[in-house]
């Protein structure tokens, strides 16, 4: 079964709820429904925007989906500032990003924490987008493939094959995020192919063949076509370009195999 590409727009800490509504409307207007047969498109807004996005998506019966940028490892309770998976599920979220390099870097999240978050997401029927990726020093040392596989193993440790089948993996080389530097399509394929081979070891070839592996890091309408043409790159986790409705729609159309809207 061919894997359907996924284009997920990570808005990071940008846009209030009114701006969120305007952007989703723009994407929906710019990307006709026919494209959604060939590509899944998701937006990942800040927590405070999710209810507004939900109302718009459900009210207008839009085909794009949405998710959250993080989730708590806890079910509920005295954890000030935390947001639980059950709350996100109630808001109709499909996806939740876990282990993004900015969370790992600024909030010191390790693989065990990322695993805990992925488990909570799965418990509540959410699809975790598990992020892994190396810094420039690792890339220059030439140990990037093993580094990523180690992160992958740590972030999926103990999950059953059935659980791994419900996960999306995002490979984001840290040196390419927001820097304008993009890993070449061959670089992306090298690591994404290694990720799929490792998934086959962890969960069997059948599961590995169905898990979507995304590339993230300065993805835009100019480079997405070459990236998703790689055999093991099944879409993209898009940052800055996802804040521009027209570009995000164009990017999604390219991932669907065109023509441009």
From Swiss-Prot:
Q: Which GO terms describe its molecular function?
A: triose-phosphate isomerase activity
Q: Which EC number(s) does the record attach to this protein? A: 5.3.1.1
> Could you tell me the Gene Ontology terms of the biological process aspect for this record?
gluconeogenesis; glyceraldehyde-3-phosphate biosynthetic process; glycerol catabolic process; glycolytic process
Where located?
Cytoplasm
Q: In which pathway does it act?
A: Carbohydrate biosynthesis; gluconeogenesis; Carbohydrate degradation; glycolysis; D-glyceraldehyde 3-phosphate from glycerone phosphate: step 1/1
The enzyme's first-digit EC class, named in words, is isomerase
| Pfam families (UniProt xref) | TIM
**Catalysis: reaction(s):** D-glyceraldehyde 3-phosphate = dihydroxyacetone phosphate
| Residues of the active site | 100, 172
Is the Ribonucleoprotein keyword given for this protein? no
Cellular component terms (Gene Ontology): cytosol
Q: Which positions bind substrate?
A: 10-12, 178, 218, 239-240
List the keywords (alphabetical).
Answer: Cytoplasm, Gluconeogenesis, Glycolysis, Isomerase
Report the PANTHER family cross-referenced here. TRIOSEPHOSPHATE ISOMERASE
Family statement: Belongs to the triosephosphate isomerase family.
Subunit structure of this chain's protein: Homodimer.
The entry's function note states:
Involved in the gluconeogenesis. Catalyzes stereospecifically the conversion of dihydroxyacetone phosphate (DHAP) to D-glyceraldehyde-3-phosphate (G3P).
Name of the protein: Triosephosphate isomerase
């Amino acid at each position: 079964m061919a894997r359907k590409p996924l284009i997920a727009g990570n808005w990071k800490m940008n846009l209030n709820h009114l701006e969120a509504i305007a952007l989703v409307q723009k994407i929906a207007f710019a990307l006709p429904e026919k494209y959604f047969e060939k590509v899944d498109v998701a937006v990942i807004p800040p927590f405070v925007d999710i209810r507004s996005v939900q109302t718009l998506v459900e009210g207008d019966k839009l085909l794009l989906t949405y998710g959250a940028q993080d989730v708590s490892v806890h079910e509920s309770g005295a954890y000030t500032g935390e947001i639980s998976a059950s709350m996100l599920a109630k808001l109709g979220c499909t996806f939740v990003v876990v282990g993004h390099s900015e969370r790992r870097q600024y909030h010191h999240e390790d693989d065990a924490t990322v695993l805990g978050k992925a488990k909570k997401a799965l418990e509540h029927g959410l699809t975790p987008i598990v992020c892994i990726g190396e810094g420039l020093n690792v890339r220059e040392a030439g140990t990037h493939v093993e580094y990523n596989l180690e992160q992958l193993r740590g972030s999926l440790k103990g999950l059953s094959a059935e659980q791994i089948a419900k996960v999306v993996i995002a490979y984001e080389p840290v040196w390419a995020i927001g820097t304008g530097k993009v890993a070449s399509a061959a670089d992306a394929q090298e690591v994404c192919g290694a990720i799929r081979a490792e998934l086959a070891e962890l969960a069997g070839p059948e599961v590995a063949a169905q898990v979507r592996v995304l590339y993230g890091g300065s993805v835009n309408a100019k480079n997405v076509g070459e990236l998703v043409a790689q055999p093991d790159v099944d879409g993209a986790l898009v940052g800055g370009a996802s804040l521009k409705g027209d570009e995000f729609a164009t990017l999604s159309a390219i991932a669907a195999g065109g023509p441009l809207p």
